[in-house]
C-alpha cells in the first residue's frame, strides 16, 4: 500500500487525508500546533461548492449542526442605502445553502472525521524540511524526528514551509491592505433578518454582520491598513486600542456597528491577511501543495475553505487514477490552477473595494449595484455550481470529472 504524509491539520489537510485513504493510500497528518491550542479566527462561511465537495467524499454530515444557513448578503453604503443583494450561491438540489460556522468547530469536526476514518493525526509536529530520497520523500520535524512516505502533501497554509521547500525562491505572500477582526455579540436588535449578511461599505471601513439563530450577532471588521504591520505589532495593541479604533472608524456610519462592538465581551484582536496571486510551482519530487499553501485568497472571497476542500478531493482522484505520482500532481494542477487563481483575483478586487479612497468610494457606490448583479449571475454559473464527480476517471493531461 502506498503511503502519504500530509503536513497541516487545518481544513485541506484532514479532507485530503480522507480522500487519499479512499484512493487506497495510507495517510498520516502532522500538525504543528499542540492538541489543545485551538485555532485563531472567529468564523467563516462555507459555500455550497465546498459543502458539495464534502458530500462527494460522503462527509457532508460533518458541517450539519455546527453552523447555520447564510443564503444571502445585502450590501449597503455607510448611509444605510441598500446597494444590492446577492445569494451566496444557488442551493444544492436538496435545498442546502452556504453555512456560517466557527472556525474552531470546522477544524475540530474535520479532524474528528479523519480520525474516525482511520487517519492518524499527530500534533506538535512542525515540518522543517523535506527531500526526495530513493524510496519516497523524507520529512524532517522540529523535534528532530524524520518520517519517510511515498509522497508528501503540503496543506500547511499561507506561510507554507512545504512551498519554500518545493521552490526556495518562491515570493512571499502578498499583504492584503485591510486588517481582519471579528467577534460574537449577545442577542440584540440590529434590524436584520437572521442568516442574511449585512455588508456595509462604511465611509472609513468595511463592516459585516449576521444574526445567528438565537439572536446573537456575528461580526467582522476590516480596518484599512496600507502597509504590512511588523511581526508582533498587532498583538501588542490591546483590546482598548481596538475598541477605540473601531469606534473612530464606524461612528460616522448609520449602522449598528458601534453598538455591536460595544456589546461584544472579551478581548479584541486584529489579524493581518495575505494572498498568493500565483504560486509558480505547485509540485516537485513527490511533494505537492494544496489549499492556502498553493493559492491563499483574501478572506473577502469567502472561498478559501471551500477551495481547500475541492483541492483535497481532486488530489485524491488524481492519485487514485494516475499511477505515477508526479504525473498525478501535474494532473491535479491542471484541474485546479485556473479556477483557484480566478477566485484569488476576484478576492483581491473585493479587498481593494473595501479600502477605497473618497473618489473610488463614490464610483463604487454608483457601479456596485450593477457589478453585484453581474457578479452574482457569473458566480452562480462557474463558482458555486462547481461539482466534482468522484467516480469519473482522471486521465493525465485532461480535466475530466468536474463541471
Ligand atoms: C480572517 C479570515 C477570515 C476568513 N474567512 C473565510 C470565509 O469566510 N470563508 C472561507 O472559505 N475562507 C475564509 N478564510 C480563508 C480560510 O480560512 C482559508 O482559506 C483556509 O483555512 C485554508 O485552509 P488550509 O487547510 O489550506 O490552511 P489552514 O486552515 O491555514 O491550515 C494550515 C495548517 O497547517 C499547520 N501548519 C503550518 N505550518 C506547519 C508546519 N511547518 N508543520 C506542520 N503543520 C503546519 C497550521 O498550524 C494549520 O493548522 C478566512 C481567512 C481569514 C484569515
Walk through the language-model features, giving the residues of each.
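Conserved N-terminal helical subregion
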Residues: 2-4, 47-167, 171-184, 228-247, ...
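Conserved mid-domain beta->alpha element of the FAD-binding
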Residues: 7-22, 26-33, 153-154, 181, ...
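Flavin-binding catalytic cores
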Residues: 233-267, 325
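Short helix-loop capping/hinge motifs at secondary-structure junctions, enriched
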Residues: 61, 187-193, 228, 256, ...
